[in-house]
């Protein structure tokens, strides 16, 4: 009987959670339809990621995407899955994917009111060595009265109504940020549902970990070089920060959310506009971190305030615990004033 007593009979799934939030806001239920469909794609991708070796899904598919990355077989599969489930949710009108050069306009008979920007498989260069990868998404409402077009996706991150990511790691986790905050759901493979495990997640005010690719150190600007040196050799003789960098944005940002600290993918001499894409990488992650009480900046401005001009626009990003990001900004402003 003890085993039965330990089984939760009042579980909160993603569907239940979003329905409850929609009921409070007197919503139409379209967001529930959209997120339900997205969860279906995430479950399918999670299974595909775990079966990749057996199903011969590793390796290059023979093409490059619009941003020049080599496309893996799993990328192609994941993109097709997300596009198809979002179209069939009857809740979307415009889809922007890292893998497609142009925005996808949903057929008139399937259209809803939401615009979704997504990276179907972020960190895919890590697939072959089994490092954690993920799916990132940002959801906007269509605000123009015109027929759906690519322009509907060119909204600042402040307009997001929901954003988040799925992390395919030792378990599959869905992190969902909405107006009410950030909540984490774990995929229970036994019942095939995402179960709420962490409600109203908040990032630490200050962490003890910094995360960036120091292989580009020779191209860092002086402000970044000074900041990293202060983390390694604190001027007040406090404990130095630990360095952690996976190279998969979902994994690095999730660790930053859970443990605190700072994640940086700044501009440098080789990439003056940064390397990460604004609509489906920077904005969703910035939204999650801000809703958790953190900060996200380019150094010059808040990430969520950027008005995009291109669906594949790039942006620098520095995000994490508010005290850590504030310290970075103080050093950045000091150097900018010189």
UniProtKB/Swiss-Prot annotation:
Post-translational modification N-acetylthreonine, affected residues: 2
UniProt keyword annotations, A-Z: Acetylation, Allosteric enzyme, Carbohydrate metabolism, Gluconeogenesis, Hydrolase, Magnesium, Metal-binding, Phosphoprotein
Biological process, per Gene Ontology: cellular response to magnesium ion; cellular response to xenobiotic stimulus; fructose 1,6-bisphosphate metabolic process; fructose 6-phosphate metabolic process; fructose metabolic process; gluconeogenesis; negative regulation of cell growth; negative regulation of glycolytic process
Associated pathway: Carbohydrate biosynthesis; gluconeogenesis
Protein activity control: Subject to complex allosteric regulation. The enzyme can assume an active R-state, or an inactive T-state. Intermediate conformations may exist. AMP acts as an allosteric inhibitor. AMP binding affects the turnover of bound substrate and not the affinity for substrate. Fructose 2,6-bisphosphate acts as a competitive inhibitor. Fructose 2,6-bisphosphate and AMP have synergistic effects.
Residues where N6-succinyllysine is found: 151
Protein residues bound to Mg(2+) 2: 98, 119, 121
Leader peptide range in chain numbering: none
Cofactor(s) essential for the protein: Mg(2+)
GO CC annotation, single: cytosol
Catalysed transformations (reactions): beta-D-fructose 1,6-bisphosphate + H2O = beta-D-fructose 6-phosphate + phosphate
Molecular function, one GO term: metal ion binding
Cofactor annotation remark: Binds 3 Mg(2+) ions per subunit.
Phosphoserine modifications at: 208
Modified residues (Phosphotyrosine): 216, 245, 265
Binding site for substrate: 122-125, 213-216, 244-249, 265, 275-277
Record-listed AMP binding positions: 18-22, 28-32, 113-114, 141
Residues holding Mg(2+) 3: 119, 122, 281
Quaternary structure, from the entry: Homotetramer.
Function: Catalyzes the hydrolysis of fructose 1,6-bisphosphate to fructose 6-phosphate in the presence of divalent cations, acting as a rate-limiting enzyme in gluconeogenesis. Plays a role in regulating glucose sensing and insulin secretion of pancreatic beta-cells. Appears to modulate glycerol gluconeogenesis in liver. Important regulator of appetite and adiposity; increased expression of the protein in liver after nutrient excess increases circulating satiety hormones and reduces appetite-stimulating neuropeptides and thus seems to provide a feedback mechanism to limit weight gain.
Similarity comment: Belongs to the FBPase class 1 family.
Protein name per its UniProtKB record: Fructose-1,6-bisphosphatase 1
């Amino acid at each position: 009987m003890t085993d039965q007593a330990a089984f939760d009979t009042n579980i909160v799934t993603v569907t239940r959670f979003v329905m409850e939030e929609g009921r409070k806001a007197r919503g139409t239920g379209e967001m529930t339809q959209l997120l339900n469909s997205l969860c279906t794609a995430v479950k399918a991708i999670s299974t595909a990621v775990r079966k990749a070796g057996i199903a011969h899904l590793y390796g290059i598919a023979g093409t490059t995407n619009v941003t020049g990355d080599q496309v893996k077989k799993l990328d192609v599969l994941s993109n097709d899955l997300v596009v198809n489930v979002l179209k069939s949710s009857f809740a979307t009108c415009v889809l922007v994917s890292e893998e497609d050069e142009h925005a996808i306009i949903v057929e008139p008979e399937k259209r809803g009111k939401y615009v979704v920007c997504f990276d179907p498989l972020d960190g895919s260069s890590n697939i072959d060595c089994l490092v954690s990868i993920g799916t990132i998404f940002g959801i906007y409402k269509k605000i123009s009265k015109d027929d759906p077009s690519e322009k509907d996706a060119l909204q600042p991150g402040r307009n997001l109504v929901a954003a988040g990511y799925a992390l395919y790691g030792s378990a599959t986790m869905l992190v969902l940020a909405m107006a009410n905050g950030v909540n984490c759901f774990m995929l229970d493979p036994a019942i095939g549902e995402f179960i709420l495990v962490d409600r109203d997640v908040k990032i630490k005010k200050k962490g003890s970990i910094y995360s960036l690719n120091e292989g580009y150190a020779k191209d860092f600007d002086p402000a970044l070089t000074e900041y990293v040196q202060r983390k390694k050799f604190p001027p007040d003789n406090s404990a130095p920060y630990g360095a952690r960098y996976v190279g998969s944005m979902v994994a690095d940002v999730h660790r930053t959310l859970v443990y605190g600290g700072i994640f940086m993918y700044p501009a440098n001499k080789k990439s003056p506009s940064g390397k990460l894409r604004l609509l489906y990488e920077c904005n969703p992650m910035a939204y999650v971190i801000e809703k958790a009480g953190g900060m996200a900046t380019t150094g010059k401005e808040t990430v969520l305030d950027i008005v995009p001009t291109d669906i594949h626009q790039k942006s620098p990003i520095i995000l994490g615990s508010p005290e850590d990001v504030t310290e970075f900004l103080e050093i950045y402003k000091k150097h900018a004033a010189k």
